[in-house]
From Swiss-Prot:
Record PANTHER family: UPF0597 PROTEIN YHAM
HAMAP family: UPF0597
Pfam family, one: SDH_alpha
Name the record gives this protein: UPF0597 protein CTC_02309
Sample GO molecular function, one term: L-cysteine desulfhydrase activity
Biological process terms in GO annotation: L-cysteine catabolic process to pyruvate
Protein family membership: Belongs to the UPF0597 family.
Domain of life: Bacteria
InterPro entries for the chain: Ser_deHydtase-like_asu (IPR005130), UPF0597 (IPR021144)
Length: 423
C-alpha cells in the first residue's frame, strides 16, 4: 500500500459512526459478543473494566433512554445488542426493552467491577447460562477483541503483537510528518476523501437536534443567541451536539480516533465556520480531513484513553490545524496553530464523560479558533516555552509524554474523588 493509500485507510479506520458514548458502548459491544458465544439465555454476567472505562462510563447518558452508566448499557446489550453493529450495537433498542434491562439489574444478573492492575483500555465480560460460560476480553482499543472463550476453551486469541489492527494502523501515522499530512490533504482527489462529508452531515444533524430541543445544560442554546457571531456560532453548534450526545439522544455521531466527542470537535468548528464564511464544500472537506489526521496523530502518542481531555489536547489541536487550513494558512502557520494550542490548553483533565463535557468542548473550540487566528497573524508561542519544542511533531510527542508518563496517577485520584462523592 502506498503512503497515500495508507492515510486513506487510517481515516476510514479511525473515523467511524458511534451511537452513544464510546466507553459504555464498547462494554455493550463486548457484552453482545459474550452473549452470542454463550448461545443461551444469560443468567449472570460480570463486567470488569479499567479505571478509564469506569470513569468515562459512570455519568453518561445511554442513547434512547433517560438512564446513565455502564450497567444499563450492558443490560440493554443482553436484551438487544448485536456485535455486527459495532459502535452502534444498541441501535435496535425500543422503549419496551428498557424495563427488561432494569429488571436484569434489579435481579443482580449484571455486576460491574473495577479491574485493578491492568494497563490501558481493558474490558472483560464473563457470561454464564444454564449450561455454558463465555468470556470476552477487549484491550487497547474500543473494538479490539483479543480473547474469545467458551467453556474455558479458547475460540480466538490475538498475541500482543497482533492484538490490534486498529491501534497498529492508528500508530502508522507516526511515520508521517505534519507536512506529509498537509501535502496529502492538498493533493488527494476529493472523491477519495469525500466520505468525510458523511461525518460533517451526521454531526450537524445531532447538533441541530441538541439546539432545537434545548438538550442538556442549555449551553448551546445560550451561545446560539449570538449566532451572527461566527465564533459563538461554532461554539454553539459543537456544544449543542455534545449536550445531545451526553444526554443519550438516539442519533449517531462521526467519531475521530475512537471518540465521538473528539469527532464533534474535529468536525463541527470547521464545518460551522466554513458555512458562515461560505467556503466551498471541497475546502471544508479537506480542512476536516486535516483536522482528523492531526487528531489521530496526537492520539497515537497520548493513547486511546488518557487522564487529559482529548477533546482539548487532541481534537482541539486537530481543529486548530484544520481551521488554519480553511483560512488558507501556510504550513508554517499550521505548525504555529498546533503549537499555540498545545501551549494553551495542555493539562485539562478528563473526569469522565458527562453533560459538563459540553463546556469543555466549548473551551476547546474557542481555544482552537484563537490558536488558528494567532497563527494566521504570525503570532506564535515561542518554541522554548514549557513543553513546546522546535517542531510541531516534537511538541506533540512531549504532550504525549506529559499526558501518559507525567499523569500516571491522575486517573486513580480522579476516580477516587468521584467514588467518594457516591459514598
Amino acid at each position: 500500500m502506498n503512503r497515500e493509500g495508507l492515510l486513506i485507510e487510517i481515516l476510514k479506520n479511525q473515523v467511524v459512526p458511534a451511537l452513544g458514548c464510546t466507553e459504555p458502548i464498547a462494554v455493550a459491544y463486548g457484552v453482545s459478543k459474550a452473549k452470542e458465544i454463550l448461545g443461551e439465555e444469560v443468567e449472570h454476567m460480570e463486567v470488569n473494566v479499567d479505571r478509564s472505562i469506569f470513569k468515562n462510563g459512570k455519568e453518561v447518558g445511554i442513547p434512547g433512554t433517560d438512564k446513565k452508566g455502564i450497567l444499563i448499557a450492558a443490560a440493554l446489550s443482553i436484551i438487544v445488542g448485536k456485535s455486527e453493529y459495532s459502535l452502534q450495537v444498541l441501535k435496535d433498542l425500543t422503549n419496551e426493552d428498557i424495563p427488561k434491562a432494569l429488571e436484569l439489574i434489579q435481579n443482580n444478573v449484571v455486576k460491574l467491577n473495577l479491574k485493578e492492575g491492568v494497563k490501558g483500555l481493558y474490558i472483560e465480560i464473563i457470561a454464564s447460562g444454564n449450561k455454558n460460560k463465555s468470556r470476552v476480553v477487549i484491550k487497547n482499543n474500543h473494538l479490539n477483541i483479543v480473547l474469545l472463550e467458551k467453556n474455558g476453551m479458547c475460540i480466538e486469541e490475538k498475541s500482543e503483537e497482533k492484538s490490534s489492527v486498529s491501534v497498529n494502523l492508528r500508530d502508522e501515522i507516526r511515520n508521517f510528518t505534519i507536512k506529509d499530512l498537509k501535502d496529502f490533504v492538498d493533493n488527494i482527489d476529493i472523491e477519495d476523501i469525500y466520505f468525510i462529508n458523511e461525518g460533517i452531515a451526521m454531526n450537524k444533524r445531532i447538533a441541530k437536534e441538541g439546539l432545537d430541543n434545548k438538550l442538556g445544560l442549555g449551553l448551546g442554546d445560550l451561545l446560539k443567541s449570538e449566532e451572527n457571531n461566527v465564533i459563538e456560532y461554532a461554539k454553539a453548534v459543537t456544544s449543542g451536539a455534545c449536550e445531545a450526545r451526553m444526554s443519550g439522544y438516539p442519533l449517531p455521531v462521526m467519531s475521530s480516533a475512537g471518540s465521538g466527542n473528539h469527532g464533534l470537535v474535529a468536525i463541527l468548528p470547521i464545518a460551522s465556520i466554513g458555512e458562515k464564511l461560505e467556503k466551498n464544500e471541497e475546502k471544508v472537506i479537506r480542512s476536516v480531513a486535516l483536522s482528523h489526521l492531526v487528531t489521530i496523530y496526537i492520539k497515537s502518542y497520548t493513547g486511546a484513553l488518557s487522564p487529559v481531555c482529548g477533546c482539548g489536547v487532541a481534537a482541539g489541536v486537530g481543529a486548530s490545524a484544520g481551521l488554519c487550513y480553511l483560512m488558507d494558512g501556510t504550513l508554517e502557520q499550521i505548525y504555529g496553530a498546533i503549537k499555540n494550542m498545545i501551549a494553551g490548553i495542555s493539562g485539562m483533565i478528563c473526569d469522565g464523560a458527562k453533560l459538563g463535557c459540553a463546556y469543555k468542548l466549548c473551551i476547546s473550540v474557542s481555544s482552537s479558533i484563537d490558536a488558528a487566528r494567532m497563527a494566521l497573524k504570525n503570532i506564535f508561542v515561542p518554541s522554548n516555552d514549557g513543553i513546546l519544542d522546535e517542531t510541531a511533531e516534537k511538541s506533540i510527542q512531549n504532550l504525549g509524554k506529559v499526558s501518559t508518563d507525567g499523569m500516571s496517577c491522575t486517573d486513580e485520584v480522579i476516580l477516587e474523588v468521584m467514588l467518594d462523592r457516591c459514598n
